[in-house]
Amino acid sequence: MKEFKIKDICEVISGGTPSTKINSYWNGDIIWLTPKDLSSNKNKRIYNSEETITEEGLTHSSAQMLPINAVLLSSRAPIGYLALAGKELCTNQGFKSMICNTDYVLPEYLYYLLQTKVEELNNISTGSTFKELSGSLLKNFKVSIHDLDFQQHIVDIRRKSA
């Protein structure tokens, strides 16, 4: 087992929101998640969102397309909702998403690992009215990672028990 900062094993990406004043940015074909979508998601993977955006909306916002298996973490209101992207999608700024370097960590393993770290993530978050987990705090958050074979073993066990 070896300790890593998240930034050493993942690319951390923040989300964004297109202007709500421009109708042509909304109701497109691109899944656009908010923490509310994860609050009602009872599965490990998420495939749909309440709201969608257009390609134009994506282009004119700080939202970025995330690949299948990106680890999605709500970073405010509340901190700690987790899911894996079941298809390409993007998120609002209430997320910090992680694209895993699979030479070090399997996305599904990181998903399970972070489920055990929600309290720690809340404890390091800042803010007076609403706590928020910044990109910098998440990037520097340390996790202990097993070798890939053991990670796969854990994932297999979790899949069988689900």
Located regions from the model:
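Non-catalytic DNA-recognition/assembly elements of restriction-modification systems
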Residues: 1-16, 28, 32, 140-162
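Specificity-determining recognition surfaces
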Residues: 96, 114-143
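A short beta-sheet element
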Residues: 34-35, 50-115, 134
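Short glycine-enriched loops at secondary-structure junctions
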Residues: 38-39, 78-79, 127
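Short acidic/glycine-enriched loop/turn segments that link adjacent beta-strands
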Residues: 27-29, 91-92
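A short beta-turn/loop motif at secondary-structure boundaries
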Residues: 23-25, 88-89
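Sequence-specific dsDNA recognition surfaces
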Residues: 7-23, 36-68
